[in-house]
Every structure is written in structure tokens, then in C-alpha cells.
């Protein structure tokens, strides 16, 4: 393919951002100090989750979750490097189950659609957030009906046993089984759910899972927990699990492996954490036995209403805010031993599929285009900056480093425009090597300031001696890394051409400066002027003994005539200190040539050559910061099926 824009110009611009002192700053620079020799505590990647809800009618959920559009979407979600997203929390999964028979005559279940969806997740190395939600062909209508309560327990037990047999207990025990989503919103479709019915339903879920294996975990209720007497079902469930009576065993108290709540930000980052603290304190006061029970916020979005178009959801504004929320939770909650509660998971509910006329502006990870002027019509997805940001977060490692932001002598916490998360990886053996990541955000929550830059001085010290120490910078802002911005510059085409898609995809990745030797003495000083909003990742690596491992699970997915998607796994690559993946193509399966593309560490690539020739074989390998290649993946053949000639369908967006 042709170069899409002068690479040298982009790198020169990034170099000027990082190396040149800001000209006439309007305010004192922010000083970011990081001590690589001062590890504080473990850094758990508690943010690696997303979710979505199939649209109405829920009885046809299979048509959405198994659609080609969603298959592409989940390929993108699973392609975040280093399992940067590992869970997809999904509503209405039991609408994928068909019930046969009737009460009194025996029931049987068809799990074909559910099998298909869970297989799709597993193919993309994703876990389900498994909400036990749906009426299974409308059979379940009333959980005060004791017969239905026993039948529900049997259904839950049957599906749990089925997937233990299909995937193994080691895999299924990682799933977060959860109650019906947001019970106090009463979105039960045709199911009657009283307080007693909801408690009966929960006990049936619990005992059904336990019958399959005690290793399976169950939590809930996944709701807002407004102050009592509001949210009666949520508080009632906690009361029941704390000291109520188990419907099946008659014992006092019912297991609750985690407490899930939903608090969103109303366009404020810090509001999410502040609300969580209030709810956690109420839970501790009312139910002291749950003081150590893990708490999830598995819908922790900056704003309610996934389909509500918002300009800031389209670009780096959203990406930087998501990083800011995560940094606030780590720095203000988990690292604060005096006020910490057992916070275990933060999920953004943003794996939906966008629709016309707002491909970028809805709460999604990808931008979806339904291209109806081809024969046949087809779908294209673009990676939004928020999904790219999950890849930057994936470069953080298991130990948090001491880091501090100050301005004019005043130390600033994470509830300010500039913040930082820093981590290190300690070698686990002779073949391993030390590395550190410093992720700096510039974010004013949902507000973008196109003409404003923030002067920053980053001082990193304490880097231990090591072989071949280098550093790499990756930078995102709306001027350089916004497919939405490129789409607007192109005139917002409804059906972009192949060339227009190439131009938008050229803005998907961060601008990366090639590896440079770390200065002597284990110290590094950078003086970037960060646009507001923006993200800057500084990655420092010692050279591992061996080059990267092999790329695996390479697949080729068709897009349209002359275009395809390549997806692969980095699970055996090992190193995080990767510069790019080299992709090679062969028309005859013998002589391979490299595909020209920008450096990228995302585990997915859209091949859309000018020639339109895509039939052949493909292979992929990783290249590290020292230009050492790993082994090629096993080759994957792709044969394009010719499309019958004829006029394109005009279609409608």
C-alpha cells in the first residue's frame, strides 16, 4: 500500500513535543517525578472488562450476539495487546437458550446459540461476565412459583455442567456469574419478580452453580444501591445473603462471592469513585460480614445512555477520561490503605455496536460503518482511541512505582488535569528482563480544549542497570490520532471508500517514536507539551536474553472484495517490549513479501491493498525494540470468493 502521510513529519512533530521546552507557557509546568527504584505495592489490572446489551426484542438476542458485526467487534475487543480486555459482561444470555417440554412432563434445553456465543468469546480469548438473565423461551415467568424455582436451579446447574465439560473447570471457574442486571429497574420483560421471587431466584442460581462445582463464583445485584428505602431489591438481596434463610437448604445466610454495583459519572471522573465510597460505607455499616467481600463496579461509565451521541465519546477525550478514572481508583482508593475497601473490578459498558448517523459518537470501542453501496453490502469497523488506550494500559505491569505530579511546588492528586500511573516488572528468571511503563494523562473530563497545551516535565530516575536499555514513547491526541477527526475532514462520508478507510485507519495507533538508548545514570528527562486531552506512554526496557516468542492463532476474516482482517494472539510472544508486528503475504504460498504499514502492536490488521489482490497466504511475527524478530506464525491461507457482476445495491444508511 502507499504511505498514507509522511511518517517523518509525524515523528518530527512528536520529537518536538517531547524534547522542546514549551514556548511561553501560560501556567507553570506540571512536574512528573517517577522513581523506578521505589516499588510501592502490587498493581492489579482491575479494569480489563467491557460489556453490552442486545437490543429489543431480547427474545431475538441471538441475531445480535451472533451477527457478523458482533463477531468483528469481539475480534477487535480480543485483539487488545496482552489481554488488555479479558471480560465481556453480557445481558440476556439465557434468551439464547430454547426450552422444550413443559412443567410436569419434563424440560429439556437447546444451548446451540449460547454455545455459539461462548465459543466466539473463547476464540477471541475473552471470558463472559455471565449474567443469569432471561426467561429461556418465555418458560420462566414467576419465581414465587416453587416449581419454577426448582426448574431454574436445574437449568443453571445444567448449563454450568455443560460448559465445565466443554471448556474445563479451570476456565469456567474464571467466569463472573452474576444476577439479573439492575433488578430495581424492573427490566424483567415478561417475568414477574417480587422481592421474595428475586430472593428465590438468587438461591436457585447459587445452588445450581454449587451443584455443578463449588469453585464457581456468583455475585450481584449489579444495580445503583440508592440510599434505603430506595433500591429495595438490591438491599434486600444483601440482607438475605447476610442473615436470611436459604430457600433450598434452610440454612442462615447465602453465599455472595462479590457485590456488584453500578455508579456512573454524570460527565465527572471523580464522581464515580466518590459514589462508590458512599455505597461501600453503607454496606459496611449495614452488613459487617461483607466488609471483606470484593466490590465490582461493572458499569462505571462516565455517562449513562450508551446510544446518546456525544462528541467527546468519539475521540481522545473519552480515552483520556477512562485512563483518568482508572488512575483515580488506583491512586486514591487502592493505594490508600487508610480508606481502601476491597475494590476488585471496574468495567466500562462500551462493547456496543454504533449505528448511523453516529459511527463514532456513541459509547463504543469501535466505530461501525454499514457500507451499503457495495455488492453485497458489508460492515467496516474502526478502532476508536478508547480501545487504543486499553492497549496502553495493558503495558502497565504488576508493581506500582512511586510517582508524583506537582505544579508550582504543590503536589496534585489524581483529581486534576494531569495525572500518572507508573509500574515496573521485575525479572522472573534469566531469560526475563526489567521494564517500566509511565502513563501520563492530560484530561479535563468530557471537555476538550483544541487550542490548549499543558507543559509537562517528566523526570524518571532509579532505572537499574541492564543490557540494552532503551525507551519508547507512544502519544495520542486529537490532532494526530483521531479516526473521527479524519472522517470529519473527509466530509463525514456515509459510505467511505477503501482509500478513505485507509486514511481513517492511519490515525488509529499512537504516534510512536523509535527506540532510543536510555541516558547514562538511569535517569530520563522529557519535556512534552501535551495537548488537552492526550495520553503519553513512556516505556523503558532492558533487552531480554531472547527475541519474542511465536505469534499464534492467526485468522483471516473477510471484509469485502479486496479486503480482509487478520487477527492473532500474543499469548506466547512473551515480551511487552514490542515495536511492531511484521505481516507478510504470498500469492503462491512460497515467496513472501512484507506488507507495508505503520508500526503497530495491536493484534489485528485490516489488509486493503490498492491492487485488491488478497487471495494467498499470510504469516505474522513480532519485532522487539532491538529489531529482533520472533518466529513467524503458522501461515494461514485465504481464498477470496468472487462476487457475481452487477450494479451495487444503493441501500440506505
Swiss-Prot record:
It catalyses: Hydrolysis of unsulfated alpha-L-iduronosidic linkages in dermatan sulfate. Its EC number is 3.2.1.76. Alpha-D-mannopyranose binds at residues 54, 56, 58, 306, 488, 492. Changing residue 383 to H: In MPS1S; 2-3% of normal activity. It comes from Homo sapiens. Changing residue 82 to Q: Reduction of protein levels. Changing residue 602 to I: In MPS1H/S; reduction of activity and protein levels. This is Alpha-L-iduronidase. One of its GO terms (cellular component) is lysosomal lumen. Changing residue 380 to R: In MPS1H/S and MPS1S. N-glycosylation at Asn-372 contributes to substrate binding and is required for full enzymatic activity. It is linked to Mucopolysaccharidosis 1H: A severe form of mucopolysaccharidosis type 1, a rare lysosomal storage disease characterized by progressive physical deterioration with urinary excretion of dermatan sulfate and heparan sulfate. Patients with MPS1H usually present, within the first year of life, a combination of hepatosplenomegaly, skeletal deformities, corneal clouding and severe intellectual disability. Obstructive airways disease, respiratory infection and cardiac complications usually result in death before 10 years of age. The keyword Glycoprotein applies.
Amino acid at each position: 500500500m502507499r504511505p498514507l502521510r509522511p511518517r517523518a513529519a509525524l515523528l518530527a512533530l512528536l520529537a518536538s513535543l517531547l524534547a522542546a521546552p514549551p514556548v511561553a507557557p501560560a501556567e507553570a509546568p506540571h512536574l512528573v517525578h517517577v522513581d523506578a527504584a521505589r516499588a510501592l505495592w502490587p498493581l492489579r489490572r482491575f479494569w480489563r472488562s467491557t460489556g453490552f446489551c442486545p437490543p429489543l426484542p431480547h427474545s431475538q438476542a441471538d441475531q445480535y450476539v451472533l451477527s457478523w458485526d458482533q463477531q468483528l467487534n469481539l475480534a477487535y475487543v480480543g485483539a487488545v495487546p496482552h489481554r488488555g480486555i479479558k471480560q465481556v459482561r453480557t445481558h440476556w444470555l439465557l434468551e439464547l437458550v430454547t426450552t422444550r417440554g413443559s412443567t410436569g412432563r419434563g424440560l429439556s434445553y437447546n444451548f446451540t446459540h449460547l454455545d455459539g456465543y461462548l465459543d466466539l468469546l473463547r476464540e477471541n480469548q475473552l471470558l463472559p461476565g455471565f449474567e443469569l438473565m432471561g426467561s429461556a423461551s418465555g418458560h420462566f415467568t414467576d419465581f414465587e412459583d416453587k416449581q419454577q424455582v426448582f426448574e431454574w436451579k436445574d437449568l443453571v446447574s445444567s448449563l454450568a455442567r455443560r460448559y465445565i465439560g466443554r471448556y474445563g473447570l479451570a476456565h469456567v471457574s474464571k467466569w463472573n456469574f452474576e444476577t439479573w442486571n439492575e433488578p430495581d429497574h424492573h427490566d424483567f420483560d415478561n417475568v414477574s419478580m417480587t422481592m421474595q421471587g428475586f430472593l428465590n431466584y438468587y438461591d436457585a442460581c447459587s445452588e445450581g452453580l454449587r451443584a455443578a462445582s463449588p469453585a464457581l463464583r456468583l455475585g450481584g445485584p449489579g444495580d445503583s444501591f440508592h440510599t434505603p428505602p430506595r433500591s429495595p431489591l438490591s438491599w434486600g438481596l444483601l440482607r438475605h445473603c447476610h442473615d436470611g434463610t436459604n430457600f433450598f437448604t434452610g440454612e442462615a445466610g447465602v453465599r455472595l462471592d462479590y457485590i456488584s454495583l453500578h455508579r456512573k459519572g454524570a460527565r465527572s471522573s471523580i464522581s464515580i469513585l466518590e459514589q462508590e465510597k458512599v455505597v461501600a460505607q453503607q454496606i459496611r455499616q449495614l452488613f459487617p460480614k461483607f466488609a471483606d467481600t470484593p466490590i465490582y463496579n461493572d458499569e462505571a461509565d462516565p455517562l449513562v445512555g450508551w446510544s446518546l451521541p456525544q462528541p467527546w465519546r468519539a475521540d481522545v477525550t473519552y480515552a483520556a477520561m477512562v485512563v483518568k478514572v482508572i488512575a483515580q481508583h488506583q491512586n486514591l482508593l487502592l493505594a490508600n490503605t487508610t480508606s481502601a475497601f476491597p475494590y476488585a473490578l471496574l468495567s466500562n459498558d462500551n462493547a456496543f455496536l454504533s449505528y448511523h448517523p453516529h459511527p463514532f459518537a456513541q459509547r463504543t470501542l469501535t466505530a461501525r460503518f454499514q457500507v451499503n453501496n457495495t455488492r453485497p453490502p458489508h460492515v467496516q469497523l474502526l478502532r476508536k482511541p478508547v480501545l487504543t488506550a486499553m492497549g496502553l494500559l495493558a503495558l502497565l505491569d504488576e508493581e506500582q512505582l512511586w510517582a508524583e505530579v506537582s505544579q508550582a511546588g504543590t503536589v496534585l492528586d489524581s483529581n486534576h488535569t494531569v495525572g500518572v500511573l507508573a509500574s515496573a516488572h521485575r525479572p522472573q528468571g534469566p531469560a526475563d528482563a526489567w521494564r517500566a511503563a509511565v502513563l501520563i494523562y492530560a484530561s479535563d473530563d468530557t471537555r476538550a480544549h483544541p487550542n490548549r497545551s499543558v507543559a509537562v516535565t517528566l523526570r524518571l530516575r532509579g532505572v537499574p542497570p541492564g543490557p540494552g536499555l532503551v525507551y519508547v514513547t507512544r502519544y495520542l491526541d486529537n490532532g494526530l490520532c483521531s479516526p473521527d477527526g479524519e472522517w470529519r475532514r473527509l466530509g463525514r462520508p456515509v459510505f467511505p471508500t477503501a482509500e478513505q478507510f485507509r486514511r481513517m485507519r492511519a490515525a488509529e495507533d499512537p504516534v510512536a517514536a523509535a527506540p532510543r538508548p536510555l541516558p547514562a545514570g538511569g535517569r530520563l528527562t522529557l519535556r512534552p507539551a501535551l495537548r488537552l486531552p492526550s495520553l503519553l506512554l513512556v516505556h523503558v526496557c532492558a533487552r531480554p536474553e531472547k527475541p519474542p516468542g511465536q505469534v499464534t492463532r492467526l485468522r483471516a476474516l473477510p471484509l469485502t472484495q479486496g479486503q480482509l482482517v487478520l487477527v492473532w494472539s500474543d499469548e506466547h510472544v512473551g515480551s511487552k517490549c514490542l515495536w511492531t508486528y511484521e505481516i507478510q503475504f504470498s500469492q503462491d504460498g512460497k515467496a513472501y513479501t512484507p506488507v507495508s504499514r505503520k508500526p503497530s502492536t495491536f493484534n489485528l490488521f485490516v489488509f486493503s491493498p490498492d491492487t485488491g489482490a488478497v487471495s494467498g497466504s499470510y504469516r505474522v511475527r513480532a519485532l522487539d525494540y532491538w529489531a529482533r524478530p520472533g518466529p513467524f506464525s503458522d501461515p494461514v491461507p485465504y481464498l477470496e470468493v468472487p462476487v457475481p457482476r452487477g450494479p451495487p445495491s444503493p441501500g440506505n444508511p
